[in-house]
Regions:
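An N-terminal, well-structured beta->alpha segment
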Residues: 6-104, 196-223, 231, 497
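Gly/Ser/Thr-enriched, mixed-charge loops and adjacent short helices
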Residues: 13, 32-41, 152-282
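Conserved phosphate/anionic-ligand binding catalytic regions in large, soluble enzymes, centered on
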Residues: 37-57, 144-145, 227-239, 382-388, ...
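N-terminal small/polar loop signature for handling phosphorylated ligands or for N-terminal nucleophile
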Residues: 88-151, 239, 244-302
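Short acidic, glycine/serine/threonine-rich loops at helix termini
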Residues: 98-103, 128-132, 150-156, 184-185, ...
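Phosphate-binding and adjacent anionic-ligand microenvironments
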Residues: 283, 288-289, 309, 329-502, ...
Length: 532
């Protein structure tokens, strides 16, 4: 059966690279062919993300066409006026991204829906911001974000500008399953329903970026920046200029988009070594901080000088700096700040002191957006997750690494104007709220083993961890997350959390404590790993 299916795919596949793969599979080992055609790539709240390869388990044009057909069918059935409001489509510079975007537009047009393509490779935040600005009923961003170079992905937003949450993901997945990937109708590329937008969509986003600034009377400072071979470079420079900030000193060899990411092992600012080049540029130039966007520019990494050396800020530390700045320089009883269960609880203390509503959500910005939409009487002014995702204004309802870079530069400039540094500001936050320490540990496991490991912990939680008593276990079943409190709940207690990753073959452990040495917290995470 797999051989017949592969032959059918070969006849329908429009991409010559994929056709070559299929020919090699058909000429090769039967078991490998069988494995490649066993099942299909499943659509979830994160959309699709997988290696670029032929067959139903990879990212390729037939899978994208099938996915687009299901998505458009769902929108036409559930959103009034969907065909007229249309779908907005963006793409990054990864391999096949433009092809996948154009195929999505052609599928939409074939089913009578207007399709709007962004004019060139652009950051994910530009796509997310323009969904509401243009009144689209949905948005599609073709990107694998900070995944390895072999991957690509397909991220879906609804008309609110927020990523999908259940039950939309299941309904869209069910709609996708109704289509044969080898037999999806596509319109001609010159269809009147397909429109390629001009640069005004970028200009309007950049105009909005100016409103992110909260304290304009701060001194100019030097900032080093890297786009990490992604699509953020040009937009980030324009954003800094429009916001009245000095032009960043860029890492030249990483500034232009390059699908091969030649100078980084993993194009993710969180990964060890990924920011080495921008830190070196910052050090040589005497910059006050080093900034890095991931390849689709929805995340922000930050490094700061401490004495004669530099250190990477943890995602929570960036969140504390941005959060305190926003809370200090905004007003109103209707303000709302949001973070996730696995991020630090310190933002909650900040919100309480400033009299601002606060909520914790499941992991992922889709849930942060969901919280903002549920609190329609509130104004979301800041949100973050510890994985370098930051929302610093009320739109878009997604993380924005470029807007965050602009505001972080302002935070650093204000600190300098007030006679301190970003490290000094963190010290002030610790004095005011307590010295929160956070840590993470990732354990590589295939997805099924990861689920089993968390289930075992759920059914038989430990009584002690490294000699410390487990006083409470909280089970967030919908998020598949377990929270274990050691010593006491809150206060001086230690909070350990465990969950299987939704996008990678690993189980993630998170820790937080107050007034504890980082090495001690890390040893507790290692002890929890041993129990897994």
């Amino acid at each position: 059966m797999s051989r017949e299916e592969a032959q059918k795919w070969l006849e329908a596949e429009p991409d010559e690279d994929m056709r070559l793969q299929l020919r090699e599979l058909l000429a090769g080992d039967e078991a490998q062919l069988e494995g490649r055609f066993r099942g299909r790539l499943m659509f979830g709240t994160a959309g699709l993300r997988a290696p670029i390869m032929a067959g139903p388990l990879g990212m390729n044009r037939l899978v994208v066409r099938q996915t687009a057909a299901g998505l458009v069918d769902y929108l036409l059935r559930t959103v009034q006026g969907a065909s007229e409001s249309g779908v907005l489509i963006g793409f990054d510079a990864r391999r096949k991204s433009h092809d996948f975007a154009v195929d999505t537009a052609r599928v939409a047009a074939a089913r009578g829906m207007k399709a709007m393509l962004l004019p060139t490779v652009l950051p994910t935040p530009v796509l997310a911001w323009n969904i509401t600005a243009l009144g689209a009923c949905a948005g599609v961003m073709v990107t694998a974000s900070h995944n390895p170079r072999e991957d690509n992905g397909y991220k879906v937003y609804l008309g609110s500008g927020a990523q999908i949450v259940p039950p939309h993901d299941v309904a869209i997945s069910d709609a996708i399953a109704l289509f044969d990937p080898t037999d999806v109708e596509v319109a001609a590329i010159d269809s009147l329903l397909i429109q390629t937008l001009d640069d005004s969509c970028v200009e309007n986003y950049l105009q909005w970026i100016q409103s992110v600034r909260l304290c304009r009377s701060v001194p100019a400072i030097k900032v080093a920046y890297t786009a990490m071979h992604g699509v953020g470079g040009a937009t980030a420079l324009r954003a800094f200029e429009g916001a009245g900030l000095s032009e960043p000193i860029v890492v030249v060899e990483q500034q232009q988009p390059d699908a091969m990411f030649p100078t980084v092992v993993f194009p993710n600012p969180e990964e060890p070594g990924a920011m080495d080049r921008v830190i070196e540029v910052a050090r040589i130039s005497g910059a006050a901080l080093a900034l890095a966007n991931d390849p689709d520019a929805d995340r922000l990494g930050v490094a700061i000088p401490v004495g004669a050396s530099w250190r990477l800020l943890r995602g929570d530390e960036i969140g504390w700096l941005l959060g305190e700045h926003v809370l200090r320089h905004t007003q109103g009883d209707d303000r709302l700040v949001v973070t996730t269960l696995v991020s630090s609880s310190l933002l909650g203390k900040m919100a309480a002191l400033h009299g601002v509503a606060y909520e914790e959500t499941f992991t992922g910005f889709k849930w942060i957006a969901d919280a903002a939409l549920r609190h329609s009487d509130k104004r979301l002014v800041f949100a973050y997750e510890q994985a370098l995702g930051y929302l610093v204004a009320d739109r878009p309802l997604d993380k924005d690494g470029i807007a965050a870079a602009v505001l972080m530069t302002e935070v650093a400039a204000l600190a300098i104007a007030e006679g301190t540094t970003l490290q000094g500001r963190l010290n002030q936050i610790a004095e005011q709220y307590g010295r929160h320490v956070t840590g993470e540990l990732s354990v590589k496991m295939n997805p099924s083993d990861g689920l089993l490991a968390v289930d075992r912990l759920r059914s038989s939680p430990p009584v002690t961890i490294a000699g410390r008593v487990v006083v409470k276990v909280e089970d967030f079943k919908e998020a598949n997350l377990l929270r274990l409190w050691l010593d006491e709940v809150g206060g001086a207690g230690v909070r350990l959390q465990v969950r299987p990753s939704g996008t990678e073959p690993k189980v993630k452990l998170y820790g937080e404590a107050v007034d504890m040495e980082p090495d001690t917290l890390q040893s507790l995470l290692s002890a929890l790993e041993a129990i897994l």
